[in-house]
Design a protein with these regions (language model features):
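Short helix-loop "hinge" at the ATP-lid/N-box region of the Bergerat-fold HATPase_c
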Residues: 64-65
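A conserved beta-strand-to-alpha-helix junction within the catalytic ATP-binding
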Residues: 9-24
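Short alpha-helical Gxxx[C/S/T] motif in the catalytic ATP-binding
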Residues: 123, 127
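Short conserved segment of the HATPase_c
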Residues: 96-108
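Conserved micro-motifs of the catalytic ATP-binding
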Residues: 3-8, 45-48
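Conserved catalytic submotifs in the C-terminal HATPase_c
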Residues: 9-13, 34-44
Length: 168
């Protein structure tokens, strides 16, 4: 990722399939949580690396589980907003302090309140690298009423070299 040499295996993919794949892979860890999934009906196919996006969703979901009370609700939502598709993972866990928010996607950064929870501090940095490679953006924010929201957005517009192929 750091060298900028990440090779994306781009193809048309459905975000519903990406989310479903992440849910299947996390089933063992999420079975004691109430997982709520809302996939927007109007999502277009996107030109992306589905396996890497599944890794991003899986990491965000695993973090939600790691920082939430067993049995609590975790939501995964997708939506279309102008020229972006957005995937959000919402939890009712520990939440994120305003002080930690700007650093969450830095390599090796661990929020203070999470010192007793295992992790390397690389997961969110890797997610950021994957999303950046797709010309997207990733962020986190505090959730009203407690917990946090981690989200990423990807453009639905085609890379210039693919625009002609779709019209053929």
């Amino acid at each position: 990722l750091e060298s900028g040499m990440l090779q994306l295996k781009l193809d048309w993919c459905d975000l519903e399939d990406v989310v479903s794949g992440a849910l299947r892979r996390s089933k063992e860890h999420t079975q004691s949580y109430k997982i709520k999934v809302e996939i927007a009906d109007d999502l277009p196919l996107i030109y992306a690396d589905a396996a890497l996006l599944e890794h991003v969703v899986l990491n965000l979901l695993d973090n939600a589980v790691k920082y939430s009370v067993e049995g609590s609700e975790i939501e995964i939502q997708t939506c279309l907003d102008d020229s972006e598709v957005i995937v959000m993972v919402k939890d009712l866990g520990l939440g994120v302090t305003a002080k930690d928010l700007p650093h969450l996607f830095d390599k090796f950064y661990r929020a203070r309140q999470t010192e007793k929870i295992s992790g390397t501090g690389l997961g969110l940095a890797i997610c950021k690298g994957i999303v950046d490679a797709h010309r997207g953006r990733i962020w986190a924010k505090q959730r009203t009423g407690g917990g946090s929201i981690f989200a990423f957005a990807l453009p639905v517009t085609l890379p210039e070299e693919k625009a002609g192929e779709k019209n053929d």
